[in-house]
Amino acid sequence: MKFGELKSAGHFPTLLAAFLYFDFSFMVWTMLGPLATEIGESLATHGFVMSPSQKATLLALPVLSGAILRIVLGFGVDKLGAKKTALLAQSVVIIALFYGYFRGENITYGELLFVALGLGFAGASFAVALPQAGQWYPPRLQGLVLGLAGAGNVGVVLDFLFAPKIAEIWGWQAVFLVGAVLSTFIFILYAFMAKDAPADVYKPNPKKLSDYLKLLKDRDTWWFSLFYAVSFGGFVGFANYMKVYLMNTYQVEMSQFGLEYLGEENVKVVAGYFGALCIFAGAILRPVGGAIADKLGGVKSLYIFFGAVLVLAILNATVVHSFGLAIFVLFLIMANLGMANGAVFQLVPQRFSKDMGIMTGLIGCAGGLGGTALIKTLGWSKGAFDGYSAGFFIFAGVVAVALVGISMVKTRWRTTWGVSAGGKI
C-alpha cells in the first residue's frame, strides 16, 4: 500500500480537504479547555464567579452537543451530501467563534454556553469528513484513507500549546479570533477543493431512522458504546478538563517548574504545556493501539489498556504523590485510553462490517456522552469534596464495569461472528 496511490485511485484534493476540515474542527471543538482558567478570571472581574459545576458544564457542552450532532450530521450527509453538510456546520462554528470574539470581556456565562453549543458542530465533523473521504477510494485503501482523514485528535494538542500564550498576550478572546479566521480559511479551501463522489464512483445508501433503531436492539451495540464511552469519552473528557485539574491541584509546583526550567512566569501557560504533553500521548498512540489489537486481538488488548487505566486511576485517587509522578500517571492514562480507542475500532468493523456508517455515529455519540459525564463528574467531585479523588474513583468504577463486560462477551464473540471475522478477536 503506497501513499502514491492516494493521488491516482481517488480524489486527493477531497482527502486533503477532509483532513484539514477535521483537524482544525477538532482543535476548535476543544478550545474552551485550555482557556477555562482565563475565561473564569474574566467573568470574575465582572462579578460572576463560576462554581466548579458551572465550569464543568461550560467545558462539557461542546462535547455533549458534538456527540448528538454526529448523528444529525450523519443524516445530513445522506440527505444533502457531505459537502453541503460540512459547509453548513462550519458556518455555525464560524459564527459562534466571531460572536465570542466580538463580545469578548463583556460576554456573559449564558452567552458562553450558547457559544459552547455552537462549537459542538466542530466536534461532529467526524461524521462528515470520514465518509466523504472514504467515498472516493476502493476498499483496499479505506484503512489508510480513514486513518489520514481522521487524524484530527492532534488538534487538541495545538490548543494547549498555543492558546494560553495567545491569551496571555492579547486576551482569551483573541484565541476565538484566531479560531474564526482559521476556520474561515479552511471553509474557503474546503469549498474549492472538496467534491462529493459521483454516482459512478460511489453509490449512496441513505440510512433511515429505523436502521438506527434496529441496531440499538442489538446488545453488541450497547457493549461497544460502553467501551468507547470509556476510551474516547475518557480521552476527550480528561483533555477538556486537563488544565482545570492541573491548575486546581498543582499550581504551585507548575509555577516553580516554569520559572526554574522554562523561564515562563505565567503558570497558565505552563499548565497548557503539561496538558499538551499528556494529551499528545493519547492522540498519537491511537493507531498503535489498533496495530496491537491486530496482533493480539481486540479483546485481549482492551483487557490490557483498560486494566492499566483502572490501576492508574485508583493510584491517582489514593496515593499522595509528587507533581512529576502525577504527570507521569496522567500521561499513561491518556496513552492507554488512546490505544483503547484504536482497539475498539479494530473490533467494530469485524462485528458490523455492513453497518459501519451507522455504528460510527452511534458509538461516536456514546464516546461524546462518556466525555460529558466524566467532565461533570470531575466538576462535581471538586465542588463536593474540594478534590478529585471521588471523581477518579467513579471513573475507575466505570472502567471496572467495562472490564467485566469484556469478560462477559469474549467467549460469545469468539465463537460466533469472530469465527468468520477475518481478524483477531
Regions found by a protein language model. Give the residues of each.
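C-terminal membrane-cytosol helix-exit motif in multi-pass small-molecule transporters
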Residues: V181-D200, A402-K410
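Cytoplasmic helix-loop-helix junction between adjacent transmembrane helices
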Residues: V115-G152
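Glycine-rich segments within core transmembrane alpha-helices of 12-TM secondary carriers
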Residues: L141-L161, G364-L374
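Helix-loop-helix hairpin linking two adjacent transmembrane segments in secondary transporters
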Residues: L148-A194
